[in-house]
């Protein structure tokens, strides 16, 4: 083995070997265990969330594969409708070409060309992270098979009365000209205004105070052109007498009713609210309760129409309400209309006041434009009938959420579920399988030929397919079964569905998880007709945030690419990466400064195993993950530790009883074997419970502290002792080899590359059969090999050695200087342990002699420590220069007192505490605590030496 651990030298070649040998494919034996990769957008590259997700899924798959399960981890990518269309449009615009000039077919050809060029980027990154996915089964949501499944699902849901077309309010992106989902809307906190407007009462009505008008408060005065009512709270005494009366809508002259609704907060403004059902989601709900007309005043660009389109709640035209609008505003965009309408109110003496107001402004996450609630014809899934069985599946335990608290989030959304708008006004995506004749009648079918045959439509009847495509989440919702061949009854579908685990972030429980459950349970049935669930467990993790707990985003300049941590990146390239393509270029300087401060030397190459182990160690239940580069560095050191331990074992491990020769186990051998059983049980238990953090912690503790720090040291005296029986030396060599081999198998799901590399060299000595660690059996604890007596004896020995080590440290005695040791208050058990381990103790603690003092015997002037009730004494005569040591301690105490004074002064300075970021203050407080503790220890040490 190379002297130092070089991840790059081993990672790529091992992945190629595993893939070419087909080790990732299901082995065809054992109970099935399936995970479907949540498909990343084909447009993108993997971010830290994907890296985290992949580390967790691969740990599960490798763990279950080693347990003998027939594992399938299926990869794939999502066509990502809006994101992909925008990206390709921008590329074409840079060449001076618009998609409308190209036309639909040629534009789609361009997208497929682009997908062929760049679609492999994600696959390359997944490979680099060591993910053991079955590449032969890779899927894309626009593959032919998946497109057929999408059409089949749409047609079946339509036949079952669960898909319909209707005119409803949607999130409308005025730049992209499409409806978008709630997930694609970002609410931005902005400073805005609240306009208080005077609406005259009609028919001579008066308020309780004798006024002939109401004052309504609004953040969107331009929408008043579409007002259908003014609402007041039914309990508001000020307006009770006016309920059922009318106001005259200023500028428009339309009479609109005053209605009572609990939606109105009597404490907000004057307690009167204008209701515009066609341009506000809350108002739409009020409109439904009071059967108000819907007056659509905007076109698809959010420009004011010449006359409002007036509809009933069922989407039919309302011809009884006058939709006339003032000609002055026709064609104006909504913000220009706002200015002119406010000016007109002011000129008419109807503008009461304008107040500053904090707003939540909805913007499209792709276009950045302000989203307009807009009335339009769309396709919908009727979700309430689908939600009931999906709720029951979680209630009765067929699907479990881990952590369990996310079940409540799921239930609260599912019990208040709204119908799902599934159509998008895009070109890229699954085109809706619906056709219209010239009269506008709609026909749904798998293709045009089926539509014509089913409805007896001859060739003389022209049919036009719906131009819209389906919401990306619709095809993603079929992901677990469409990728296994549904609607055909394939062997893969029979074997691997339902899947076992979905690993996902909490932010898409509603948008993806819930919809997968609803669609799967309706469309996929067992032989007896009972519904199948898409997965048995949903493992929900938090967001991966930066070290300060901030969300990672391009605009914050704190995004990390997992592959930059794996392969390393120089500072200039990192700065360029973080500052290019910003939506807000003015942030570039700030981001550059921050990056140069945080990564002055760029990012070192840590390798995949260190990054994966970091992700697993941070995977505590449900909390957001604060990603810490210090942890990656620590786990890179862990890889080095394992590598160096393996070099020692391979060097010493020959003649370890691999041919059946007799062995004798030492106390240390029995102890480490016993500890191994406990670790096997603990790691397995925690992985079964999805506690990757605790499994990683148990593994780290065993390998670093018990095996490397203690057992390797305890093995040396046995191997050095020329008088030791050959069987005992062979027993220690065998234990060194076999315990490491088992530890490598335990670590493999977390750190696949380093474990494979070392295992290949160690396997012959350990008597392990097989070509790869991946397919080795998972270690199972053997309770018969737990040796409590050996554990107790070693803990006692460790206590004694640490006591001697501490005395050396406190008294500044060199580690190699032989010491005399005196022991007082020695029990019979202590005496036995001393006698049995005399050679071991003298070698490891560097002792010249050990003397047990009889009761009442005078001890020389010594530094002391306790091991249980036994007193450990190291005589100081001739070991230290008392004066020089006290002078050294005085100097160090003085330095620390200065540090305490400096940091304490900083923290008691109000100007510093008020202005400094919380993480800087926390750092200073930690410094102060550390300095105070060190000062206390030095003072104790000073007193001990002074008393000698």
Swiss-Prot record:
Transmembrane segments: none
PROSITE patterns in the cross-refs: AA_TRNA_LIGASE_I
Localization per record: Cytoplasm
Listed SUPFAM superfamilies: Anticodon-binding domain of a subclass of class I aminoacyl-tRNA synthetases, Nucleotidylyl transferase, tRNA-binding arm, ValRS/IleRS/LeuRS editing domain
Gene Ontology cellular component list: cytosol
Main location: cytoplasm
Gene3D superfamilies for this protein: HUPs, Isoleucyl-tRNA Synthetase, Domain 1, Valyl-tRNA synthetase, C-terminal domain, Valyl/Leucyl/Isoleucyl-tRNA synthetase, editing domain
Matches recorded under Pfam families: Anticodon_1 (PF08264), tRNA-synt_1 (PF00133), Val_tRNA-synt_C (PF10458)
Coiled coil: 879-945
Highest taxon listed in the record's lineage: Bacteria
Catalysis performed (reactions): tRNA(Val) + L-valine + ATP = L-valyl-tRNA(Val) + AMP + diphosphate
A molecular function (GO) term: valine-tRNA ligase activity
Enzyme Commission number(s): 6.1.1.9
The record's note on its domains: ValRS has two distinct active sites: one for aminoacylation and one for editing. The misactivated threonine is translocated from the active site to the editing site.
Subunit structure: Monomer.
Role description: Catalyzes the attachment of valine to tRNA(Val). As ValRS can inadvertently accommodate and process structurally similar amino acids such as threonine, to avoid such errors, it has a 'posttransfer' editing activity that hydrolyzes mischarged Thr-tRNA(Val) in a tRNA-dependent manner.
Protein name listed in UniProt: Valine--tRNA ligase
Organism: Pseudomonas savastanoi pv. phaseolicola (strain 1448A / Race 6) (Pseudomonas syringae pv. phaseolicola (strain 1448A / Race 6))
